[in-house]
């Protein structure tokens, strides 16, 4: 009887360890998005009506321990962030531009649109969280289903 208990305890302990390690590995993974930029350095034009939301979001990304480098540049011809009133329920929308192939592949530029219709009553922190999220798509991070 004691031998059976020992075997059962060993099996249960093994299962607990296996489950613990597999959960930790899963938690560290991310979902890859193939419409992200070809480079981790990007020139972005700020067209937002609230420039502090943009500055804080860019600062948050640039201060991470990643190779991301977002440079703010004036003028057209670059990726840009803009807000407007859109007749839809989304908060933010990332659109890749100049893709490697006709309809797929990594992007050369992007547009991020923030929907004032949905965000009008939200705090600056909420706006910033939406922009930080959308900028994540530029660096190949997909939505978590």
Model-derived features: positions:
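Sec-dependent N-terminal signal peptides of Gram-positive bacterial secreted proteins and lipoproteins
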Residues: 1-27
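Zinc-dependent metalloendopeptidases
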Residues: 25-145
């Amino acid at each position: 009887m004691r031998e059976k208990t020992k075997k059962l305890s060993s099996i249960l302990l093994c299962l607990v360890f296996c489950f613990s390690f597999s959960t930790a590995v899963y938690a560290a993974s991310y979902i890859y998005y193939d419409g992200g930029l070809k480079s981790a350095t990007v020139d972005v034009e700020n067209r937002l009506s609230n420039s502090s939301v943009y500055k804080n979001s860019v600062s948050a990304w640039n201060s991470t321990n990643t190779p991301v480098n977002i440079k703010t540049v004036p003028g057209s011809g670059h990726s840009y962030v803009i807000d407007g009133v859109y007749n839809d329920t989304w908060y933010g929308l990332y659109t890749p531009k100049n893709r490697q192939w006709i309809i797929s592949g990594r992007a050369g530029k992007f547009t991020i649109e923030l929907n004032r219709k949905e965000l009008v009553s939200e705090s600056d922190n909420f706006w910033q969280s939406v922009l930080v999220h959308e900028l994540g798509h530029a660096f190949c991070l997909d939505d978590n289903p």
